UniProtKB/Swiss-Prot annotation:
Entry-linked Gene3D superfamilies: Spore Coat Polysaccharide Biosynthesis Protein SpsA, Chain A
Function description: Activates KDO (a required 8-carbon sugar) for incorporation into bacterial lipopolysaccharide in Gram-negative bacteria.
Catalysed reaction, written as an equation: 3-deoxy-alpha-D-manno-oct-2-ulosonate + CTP = CMP-3-deoxy-beta-D-manno-octulosonate + diphosphate
SUPFAM superfamilies xref list: Nucleotide-diphospho-sugar transferases
GO cellular component, as recorded: cytosol
Protein name (Swiss-Prot/TrEMBL): 3-deoxy-manno-octulosonate cytidylyltransferase
Species, as recorded: Methylorubrum extorquens (strain PA1) (Methylobacterium extorquens)
Length: 247
């Protein structure tokens, strides 16, 4: 497996929190925090893929690399595929890691962990999950659950993803973390597929891959990164990063 390439899709047109990549957290735009965490993961070069000059400028001011992509992509995966061809047209990287641009508190170690399942040649896409401990999250449709079976230490093979409380019965429930490591060929296949029936019903694009027979494995991690989607999330991220600076 070649050194992975980390790509961070970032766009300003978020519905619930417009311009969130540029939101100030401890004096630094959020996208810069995410870029720094990705660099600290130490698994390969990091590039921000954006449709906005302002985002590219703040990354380049930090000495990072940003590429401009089309503004009309239907999903972050499509933006990822375009950025990959811009950054690496010769195919030197056969793995691409998609780190969402709204995870300013993410632990670099779990970014590094995301590629581990790809050591198995049967795995097409790798991702992350964490055990759900808070009872209210078990029935929360905004907390996506992964249903899978154990295939190795702290590793599941995904059988389904759902917004419902599942699976039934005794045992842990797992919160899916939307960070993906794709084999390059798997990403190209994925973005070429039409939307799947379950994908449209659950509004979860990873179901497209499962419906097409692709294999997704997930590493179980301890740290659940905070996704910033609302003003309340932004305030929580500011608090968490302020505490880290004090420590």
């Amino acid at each position: 497996m070649s050194d992975p390439l980390i790509l961070i899709p970032a766009r300003l047109a978020a519905t619930r929190l417009p311009s969130k990549p540029l939101a100030d957290i401890a004096g630094v735009p959020m996208i810069v925090h995410v870029w720094r965490r990705a660099v600290e993961a130490g698994i390969g070069p990091v590039v921000v893929a954006t449709d906005t000059d302002a985002v590219a400028e703040v990354i380049e001011a930090q000495g990072g690399l940003a590429v401009m992509t089309r503004p009309d992509h239907p999903s972050g995966s499509d933006r990822l595929a375009e950025a990959l061809e811009i950054v690496d047209p010769d195919g030197n990287h056969d793995v691409v890691v998609n780190v969402q641009g709204d995870l300013p508190t993410i632990d670099p170690a779990i970014i590094a962990a995301s590629v581990m399942p790809l050591a198995d040649p049967q795995v097409d896409i790798a991702t992350l999950c964490a055990v759900i401990h808070r009872p209210e999250e078990m029935d929360d449709p905004n907390v996506v659950k992964i249903i899978g079976h154990t295939v190795g230490p702290n590793r599941l093979r995904a059988l389904a993803f759902t917004r419902a409380r599942a699976p039934w019965g005794d045992g842990p429930l797992f919160h899916h973390i939307g960070l993906y490591a794709y084999r390059r060929k798997a990403l190209a296949r994925f973005v070429a597929l039409p939307q799947g029936e379950l994908e449209q019903r659950e509004k979860l694009e990873q179901l497209r891959a499962l419906e097409a027979g692709m294999r997704i494995d997930a590493m179980i991690v301890e740290d659940l990164p905070l996704g910033v989607d609302t003003p309340a999330d932004l305030e929580r991220a500011r608090t968490l990063l302020a505490i880290r600076r004090l420590n």
